[in-house]
């Protein structure tokens, strides 16, 4: 018997699928609730959909979701936007000191620092980055839409031409980990589209006494030929891109950063909120929440690999969502076992533990591949991984 908090009710787990609620004295099916069933020995809660014919609304309700707290984020972000708009670089340095615990001397990364980072980059890491760039360029080139026109009558033509945005601000997160992949996935599509002016903002690294960003990030920027890089993170970086920033120190110049036409890139809830709040004056790609992954797997999948992928997503952020969808209870148990071994040994164990145990993560048990697909579509994850040993041709190809 295990107490489990479901909404505002304290429930006692007494069977595989049911709970007796102390507050009402009646049985409620936990499988339909986002919180599911959790035990102290396991890292991830179980959401059991087996044997249930769910409506679309019930399926959506059963999915694990985080509570974002956007109202609180808005109240915190608005003063940051206002201060950067009013004071420019001076505000950026103050916020770096407050949030990143370092005060960068150079907000714009000097060219010599970029070159030094590239020269010092491990050859194997450089080779991996260059291969990632090559692959991303191949995909991005195929995504550029072709112009077209239709002649309706003599002198009457309807046409569409795709014209690149002139200047784009690219945000690369870096407060909790290093993401050269975010540099690549921001820069390469913009270059393929023909954007002429690219500026990157990424947080200063606490590991660098000079307040510059992580050297791998700088080296990746150098490989891609981007030389306008700022040691600025968080909502203040979004404000800098949206409004521009006047200089406050001699090394800044009169204008530290010109405003951009569009802002792209991932970030935490404060970055996402800032992008939403400036979207009326500058274009944005999307208001993305914390990163998430859904994995559809059957009994043939390797539980250790699945656990590693769930951990890899969870280490991004305490609110990151990691969801396993499977029709094999045996596989689910083995994944939990692997997590019990792996999580305490990972570098960011505390963050991973919080993420995996959060209401945004869980293991969804299904009757089969068809229901697994329905659950994956309802969850609609940012990243979808499919690990199936065998399936018939019919399940949605």
Give the residues covered by each predicted segment.
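Short, low-complexity intrinsically disordered segments enriched in A/P/G/S/L with frequent Arg
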Residues: 22, 30-32
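N-terminal Rossmann-like NAD(P)+-binding subdomain of aldehyde/semialdehyde dehydrogenases
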Residues: 39-166
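Single conserved hydrophobic/aromatic residue that forms the stacking wall/gate
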Residues: 1-14, 390-397
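Conserved NAD(P)+-binding/catalytic subdomain of aldehyde/semialdehyde dehydrogenases
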Residues: 226-321
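Flexible, acidic loop-helix segments that line cofactor/substrate-binding pockets
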Residues: 107-122, 287-293, 316-332, 337-365
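Conserved small-residue-rich beta-alpha loop and adjacent elements
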Residues: 150-219
């Amino acid at each position: 018997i295990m107490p489990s908090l479901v909404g505002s009710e304290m429930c006692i787990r007494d069977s595989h699928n049911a709970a007796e609620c102390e507050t009402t004295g009646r049985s409620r099916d936990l499988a339909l609730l986002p919180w599911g069933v959790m035990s102290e020995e396991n890292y991830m809660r179980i959401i059991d959909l087996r044997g249930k014919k769910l409506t679309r609304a019930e399926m959506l309700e059963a999915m694990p979701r985080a509570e974002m707290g956007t109202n609180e984020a808005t109240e915190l972000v608005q003063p940051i936007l206002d201060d950067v708009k009013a004071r420019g670089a001076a505000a950026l340095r103050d916020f770096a000191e407050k949030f990143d615990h370092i005060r960068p001397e150079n907000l714009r990364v000097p060219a010599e620092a970029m070159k030094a980072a590239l020269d010092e980059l491990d050859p194997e890491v450089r080779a991996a980055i260059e291969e990632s760039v090559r692959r991303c360029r191949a995909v991005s080139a195929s995504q550029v839409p072709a112009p077209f026109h239709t002649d309706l009558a003599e002198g009457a033509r309807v046409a569409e031409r795709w014209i690149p945005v002139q200047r784009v601000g690219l945000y690369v997160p870096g407060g909790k980990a290093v993401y050269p992949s975010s540099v690549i996935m921001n820069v390469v599509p913009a270059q393929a589209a023909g954007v002429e002016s690219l500026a990157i903002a990424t947080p200063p690294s606490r590991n660098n006494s000079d307040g510059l960003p992580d050297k791998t990030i700088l080296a990746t920027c150098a490989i891609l030929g981007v030389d306008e890089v700022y040691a600025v993170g968080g909502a203040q970086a979004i404000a800098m891109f949206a409004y521009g920033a006047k200089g406050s120190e001699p090394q800044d110049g009169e204008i530290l950063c010109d405003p951009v036409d569009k802002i792209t890139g991932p970030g935490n809830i404060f970055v996402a909120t800032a992008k939403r709040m400036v979207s009326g004056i500058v274009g944005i790609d999307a208001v993305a929440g914390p990163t998430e992954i859904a994995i559809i797997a059957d009994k043939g999948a390797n539980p250790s690999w699945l656990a590693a992928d769930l951990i890899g997503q969870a280490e991004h952020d305490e609110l990151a969502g990691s969801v396993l969808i499977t029709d094999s209870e045996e596989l689910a148990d083995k994944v939990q076992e692997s997590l019990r071994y792996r999580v305490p040994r990972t570098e960011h164990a505390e963050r991973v533990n919080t993420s995996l145990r959060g209401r945004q993560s869980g293991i969804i048990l299904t009757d089969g591949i068809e229901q697994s697909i329905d659950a994956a579509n309802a969850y609609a994850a940012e990243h979808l991984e499919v690990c199936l040993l065998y399936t018939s041709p019919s399940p949605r190809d």
